[in-house]
Amino acid sequence: MSGNAYVTASPESEPAFIDEGRCAIRNWDDQETVVSFYFRAMNKGKMTVSLQAIGHSQVEVSLLGETEEVELASDTLTLVEVGTFKVKEPGYVKVDIRGKKINAGDSFGNVESLVVKGNVGPVVCVNGDFSTHFGRRGPSTHMSYTLPEGDVEWFYNEVVVPEEGDIPSSYYMACGFGEGYFGMQNNTPYPRRILFSVWSPFVTDNPAEIPDSMRVQLVRKGEQTTINDFGNEGSGGQSYMHYDWKPGERCRFLMGVRPDKNNTTVYTAYFYDNHQNKWSLVASWRRPQITTWYTHAYSFLENFNPVMGHITRKAYYCNQWARTADGKWLPVTQGRFTCDATGNQKQRLDYKGGVENNDFFLTMGGFFNDFLESGTPFTREGNVTEAPDVDFSTLE
């Protein structure tokens, strides 16, 4: 349960939640609460579904258009059969469990595992030693871009999030580079952000451990920008500004990488403020122990909240351009779709990318069926003749 189930409905006053560490449903005492298990049946056929559960209650189990009532009547974990079901087509199966009546105690009990037997396998789910935290978040998806030959200083990208893809706890990263990333987040219930981060060359998840000589140093920042350290996924310098971007809005990003003196490199990020019709400086950082131009251009889409991995996210990445060190704009039209370890290790198969209406797109999460193999290349066509209209002399 800890890696494959979500509370998909619950009263707002005292919502139930899944305790990953203890593999338990907490606050499960309201009939409004629905706990949903997800797994992928790779073949059609018949399967018997059972609950490994504890408690004294009646619960309702729904899947594949059928509903069965099951009685839990044990103080220890017991295997309780739900029924036999026909899987007509390979794909994800959602199993909803709802409490109907508490017979003893103060909750419906706990369902620790869902047991599936039959000829529909192999069954794809988060299992073994794989992280339940990252498994429940879902597979992050990436689009890596082919930069032109020679020294590239600037990478330009546009992001459009459709209404159906605008989900809380999402990072729509636009301009990744070899040493960091730059994009926008839906941080609901907090204000939406434009986020720009640069990793330190010192490898640690604790920024306090970074020696002074290996710290990323702030060069300058925008007036509305907040500066922090960051950790947990590498460490370094973080900068962000609040911007109330909307679904359907075309958000423009400009990211620069330029080698500097004394074996350092300066990274500078600008975001186009559609409300004020101007480019706004997010920040400029200096990273030690490296001399480089722009490398490894890519975008990604991720969910950073494990309780929301059952909801699909989507974003379009549009009109990519690279500007060489000698000032020439060149279109970027080739991309390669990949995903993270959650997808590569086949813990989940709800990831996809590609080209729609001559724009790259990424989608992930929500247990959809038409996944795409990691490593698939794509080429966009569309307008590759009009370079971005950026007056660099006016940038902060």
Outline where the language-model segments fall.
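Extracytoplasmic
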Residues: 1-244, 252-259, 263-396
